[in-house]
Regions:
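Adenine nucleotide phosphate-binding catalytic loops in nucleotide-utilizing enzymes
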Residues: 100-103, 140-168
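Heptad-repeat coiled-coil segments of the DHp/HisKA dimerization-phosphoacceptor module
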Residues: 124-125, 167
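Phosphate-binding loop of NTP-binding sites
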Residues: 1-123, 129-140
Length: 168
């Protein structure tokens, strides 16, 4: 069993970039483990969990999906204290009737938070309120929103994308 903080990242896009940013930042705070690639499916998540040293301070796990019913079982394996949904995009519409259906599936990660955990929600997407409502109805003790929206708890003030780095 992991003694460190466990973070789950899901979303239609941005999972790997978010995972890598978290790995970079958290590794300066303590021993951090994250998958070396996009191991975010029913094979990759258990493999990553098995490869995680028990003494890490932080474990960062990507959770992906292709069809309904995939997020909750993977999140249940991970048992995060922090869960992030990066964004919702029309990349899974072949398997879902709407963007709201995709959002509901992705929000399944919030249902598997440890009691009192933190749900992190993108404030800049149309499904933000739906994601917040789902997070409120689960075990989350805290919900943090992020983005450029004036209502976001954590606001992006400026961003410069350069060939070898991003400055925020």
């Amino acid at each position: 069993e992991l003694k460190g903080r466990v973070i789950a990242v899901t979303g239609s896009v941005g999972k790997t970039g978010t995972k890598e940013a978290l790995r970079l930042v958290l590794s300066r705070q303590g021993k951090t483990h994250a998958p070396v690639a996009s191991y975010n499916n029913h094979w990759g998540v258990p493999l990553t969990l098995c490869r995680t040293p028990s003494d890490v301070a932080y474990g960062v796990y990507e959770i992906g999906m292709n069809s309904p019913g995939e997020i909750v079982p993977l999140a249940r394996m991970v048992r995060p204290q922090v869960a992030i949904v990066t964004t919702i995009q029309p990349v899974h519409l072949a398997a879902f009737a709407s963007l709201e259906g995709i959002a509901e599936e992705k929000a399944g990660v919030y249902w598997e938070l440890e009691k009192g955990g933190t749900a992190i929600v993108n404030a800049d997407i149309p499904q933000s309120e739906l994601l917040r409502d789902i997070a409120k109805s689960g075990p989350a003790g805290r919900i943090i929103t992020f983005g450029e929206s004036p209502d976001a708890d954590v606001k992006l003030i400026s961003c410069a994308l350069k060939p070898d780095m991003s400055v925020v």
